[in-house]
């Protein structure tokens, strides 16, 4: 009986289990679940696609609802231009995939701008959702990235029109309506945008894009596309957004990095940290919180307290619940753009400390800026900007000068970072200037290459240069001379050479050493103020160092007469001055070239002419005989006082300093026609008629023009003048031989006397040493043989004894 009862109970349980299993299959079972993962390969391609689509779920919709939704949605084909645009974007236009997030946030900002402007005239515009924010959420499990804004949203018609056709962003049409409605004609350039183009960049990282949008004048709709076609349908969940748009990206496998919180945060800070509206990212952090203690721990603590505090137990009216501290991972919205763009505020409202803090944050520098300027430019293009001059020159400032792009100027369009990858935002010589430019008139173009050619960018560049030069000009003289010029003086000189339109402004910023002060530098304005009466030229002398320049024979008479001479000691200096035709109406005169003349009285003029006539025989002898192939002409000098002679370049020839620089160029091959032309030009040989060497030469050639000693002396004087004038000798050995010959004559040594020959050393007798070595080797060999024979002798002796 008992066995029957147990058997019946088992049957009932089996029946119940079978019925329950049937119920579960009927409710939630699918073919895929029944087959299991082990039969994945038996599915058809259509089944796999269907299952992948069902895995893409929106909040509040399960797989079957999503499938039903797709079946009922209205299908559309993209406009032909849209297909071409998407292919262009995906294949080539966007070189950097990460900008998709910048574009989506920019679109969200435009939508928020719209609703905020509408709310100024419509109090009910924000009733659906008073928040004006952008929120970004990553869903690693479902491979989804959500970007949600509470902007104006889109109606069904706008979803089809704006996302299915190109150049129909909705924003431009919106601006037209607002312009017509405004009576005062106030500009609404804040709202300019190109939603239709930037939106398609989402397909750079997404296989599928789902847009859920709610407009105040329509119900909530869902737009979905895989880049081939799109569909639109009313959202069966109803109004879940209140107002605004959520863009959901089903990321490609290779784009999974964009589901990492650190990646998203860095992109937001890089491109969108100055957007006008708060941007939040759904992120986690670890917090220490208090939780109720477990019952056993609480009971134990209560017992201990009861033993220790039995005396006061009656006085406690209520007992607090026992808790403990634990670490938990808490998820919340984290604000990413807490730094507000100070360039959008009036400069009068920004404190100096704020500029310094912004500069350090923006440039990643630890030092304060040397100078800054905050301005708003208006006219053909309107933009706001803050520019900074760093305290010290960036490392490698002139490495690859001209070919390396400057990335110190960051371009924003409506607070959206566009790029810092520019070659032409600032001229090359201002490549040390750092700053931001924010324009509302530039388009949010999809290509920085296209933007680079935009005509408004050239206008911006022109204004940036002018403002930068104004900023530099306002740096205090002491700070300018001691700090700025040491760090960036070469840049200003290069600017004089390269920037024709701003050459006059840049010339006022130049600083040079001069004979006026042994250490201080001077400006050209200060030089002109100190010029002597009737002085019509600015005199300068170029050399490898100040010592070389101020000891040059070319400056002797100028310094003696009290004229100030500018010393050019940097390789770029002479190029810089050559690029300046004049300064303040005064032309520049290189004192190492022809053209140096002094104001002279009639008496002085007569004396000079008499001297020239006196030395005419020597001058002709030098030109036609002694130095026939070496000089263009020989003249009596007006610039020499101590030196016997000097070699002077023509007005369009190379000075000694310039020739040395040109021949030292790394790319110099000797085949350049212009270089060879300048280098081969003959020069003028100037003599000092008051020098004893010159006067004695005049006496000697009058006695004998063919005197070999005088001929040698003339050549040595020429070669010495070549060196003292800064030029290089083509044959230094011949120069050395002539100097030696002159020294022999001065010491009464026969010029043809030969150098004494060294006595030949007798070779060392190595025969005895060799024989001795051979004997030692033979003895050593004999010893070795004897040592080898000893064991044999011992063995024989032992045998004999036996």
Curated annotation (Swiss-Prot):
Enzyme Commission no = 3.6.4.-
For binding ATP, which residues are annotated in this chain's numbering?
107, 149, 162, 199
* Phosphothreonine modification, residue list: 782
Database matches in SMART domains: HATPase_c
Q: How does it assemble?
A: Homodimer; disulfide-linked. Component of an EIF2 complex at least composed of CELF1/CUGBP1, CALR, CALR3, EIF2S1, EIF2S2, HSP90B1 and HSPA5. Part of a large chaperone multiprotein complex comprising DNAJB11, HSP90B1, HSPA5, HYOU, PDIA2, PDIA4, PDIA6, PPIB, SDF2L1, UGGT1 and very small amounts of ERP29, but not, or at very low levels, CALR nor CANX. Interacts with AIMP1; regulates its retention in the endoplasmic reticulum. Hyperglycosylated form interacts with OS9; promoting its degradation by the endoplasmic reticulum associated degradation (ERAD). Interacts with CNPY3.
The species this protein belongs to is Oryctolagus cuniculus (Rabbit)
Q: Which residues carry this modification: N6-succinyllysine?
A: 404, 633
- List membrane-spanning regions: none
Write down what this protein is called.
Endoplasmin
Q: Which residues form the signal peptide?
A: 1-21
């Amino acid at each position: 009986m008992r066995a029957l009862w147990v058997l019946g109970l088992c049957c009932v349980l089996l029946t119940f289990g079978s019925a329950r299993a049937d119920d579960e299959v009927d409710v939630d079972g699918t073919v895929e679940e029944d087959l299991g993962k082990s039969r994945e390969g038996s599915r058809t391609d259509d089944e796999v696609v269907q299952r992948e689509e069902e895995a893409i779920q929106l909040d509040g919709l399960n797989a079957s609802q999503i499938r039903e939704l797709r079946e009922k949605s209205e299908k559309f084909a993209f406009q032909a231009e849209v297909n071409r645009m998407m292919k262009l974007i995906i294949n080539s236009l966007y070189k950097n995939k990460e900008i998709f997030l910048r574009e989506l946030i920019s679109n969200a900002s435009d939508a928020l701008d719209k609703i905020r402007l509408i709310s100024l005239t419509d109090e009910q515009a924000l009733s659906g959702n008073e928040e004006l924010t952008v929120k970004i959420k990553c869903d690693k499990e479902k491979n989804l990235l959500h970007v949600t804004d509470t902007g104006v949203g889109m109606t069904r018609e706008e979803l089809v029109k704006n996302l299915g056709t190109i150049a129909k962003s909705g924003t431009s049409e919106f601006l037209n309506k607002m312009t017509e409605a405004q009576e005062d004609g106030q500009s609404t350039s804040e709202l300019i945008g190109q939603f239709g183009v930037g939106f398609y960049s989402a397909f750079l990282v997404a296989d599928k894009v789902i847009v859920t949008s709610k407009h105040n004048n329509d119900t909530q709709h869902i737009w979905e596309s895989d880049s081939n076609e799109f569909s639109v349908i009313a959202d069966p969940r109803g109004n879940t957004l209140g107002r605004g748009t959520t863009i959901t990206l089903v990321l490609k496998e290779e784009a999974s990095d964009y589901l990492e919180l650190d990646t998203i945060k860095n992109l937001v800070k890089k491109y969108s940290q100055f957007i006008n509206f708060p941007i939040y990212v759904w992120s986690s952090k670890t917090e220490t919180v208090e939780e109720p203690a477990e019952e056993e721990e609480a009971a134990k603590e209560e017992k201990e307290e009861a033993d220790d505090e039995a005396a006061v137990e009656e006085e406690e009216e209520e007992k607090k619940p026992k808790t403990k501290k634990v670490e938990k991972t808490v998820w919340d919205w984290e604000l990413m753009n807490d730094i507000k763009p100070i360039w959008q505020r009036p400069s009068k409202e920004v404190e100096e400390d704020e500029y310094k803090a912004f500069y350090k944050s923006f440039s990643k520098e630890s030092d304060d800026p040397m100078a800054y300027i905050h301005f708003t430019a208006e006219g053909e293009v309107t933009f706001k900007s803050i520019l900074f001059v760093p305290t010290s020159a960036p490392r490698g400032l002139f490495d690859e000068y001209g070919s390396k792009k400057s990335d110190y100027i960051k371009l924003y369009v409506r607070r959206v970072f566009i790029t810092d990858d520019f070659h032409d935002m600032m001229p090359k010589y201002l490549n040390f200037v750092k700053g931001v430019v924010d324009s509302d008139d530039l388009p949010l173009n999809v290509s920085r290459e296209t933007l680079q050619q935009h005509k408004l960018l050239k206008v911006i560049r022109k204004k940036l240069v002018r403002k930068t030069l104004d900023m530099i000009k306002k740096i205090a003289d002491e700070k300018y001379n001691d700090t700025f010029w040491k760090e960036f003086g070469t840049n200003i000189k290069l600017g004089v050479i390269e920037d024709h339109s701003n050459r006059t402004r840049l010339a006022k910023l130049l600083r040079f050493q001069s004979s006026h002060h042994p250490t201080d530098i001077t400006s050209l304005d200060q030089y002109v103020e100190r010029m002597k009466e009737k002085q019509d030229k600015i005199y300068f002398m170029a050399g490898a160092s100040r010592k070389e320049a101020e000891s040059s024979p070319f400056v002797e008479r100028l310094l003696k007469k009290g004229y100030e001479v500018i010393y050019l000691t940097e390789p770029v200096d002479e190029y810089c001055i050559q690029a300046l035709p004049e300064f303040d109406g005064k032309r520049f005169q290189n004192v190492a070239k022809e053209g140096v003349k002094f104001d002279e009285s009639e008496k002085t003029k007569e004396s000079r002419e008499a001297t020239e006539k006196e030395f005419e025989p020597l001058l002709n002898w030098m030109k036609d005989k002694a130095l026939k192939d070496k000089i263009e002409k020989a003249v009596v000098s007006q610039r020499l006082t101590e030196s016997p002679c000097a070699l002077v370049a023509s007005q369009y020839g190379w000075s000694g300093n310039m020739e040395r620089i040109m021949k030292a160029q790394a790319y110099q091959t000797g085949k350049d026609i212009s270089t060879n032309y300048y280098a081969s030009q003959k020069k003028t040989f100037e003599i000092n008629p008051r020098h004893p060497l010159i006067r004695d030469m005049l006496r000697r050639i009058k006695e004998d023009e063919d005197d070999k000693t005088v001929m040698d002396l003339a050549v040595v004087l020429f070669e010495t003048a070549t060196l003292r004038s800064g030029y290089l000798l083509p044959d230094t050995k011949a120069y050395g031989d002539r100097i030696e010959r002159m020294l022999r004559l001065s010491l009464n040594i026969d010029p043809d006397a030969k150098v004494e020959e060294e006595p030949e050393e007798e070779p060392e007798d190595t025969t005895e040493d060799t024989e001795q070595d051979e004997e030692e080797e033979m003895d050593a060999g004999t010893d070795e043989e004897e040592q080898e024979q000893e064991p044999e002798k011992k063995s024989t002796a032992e045998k004999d004894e036996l």
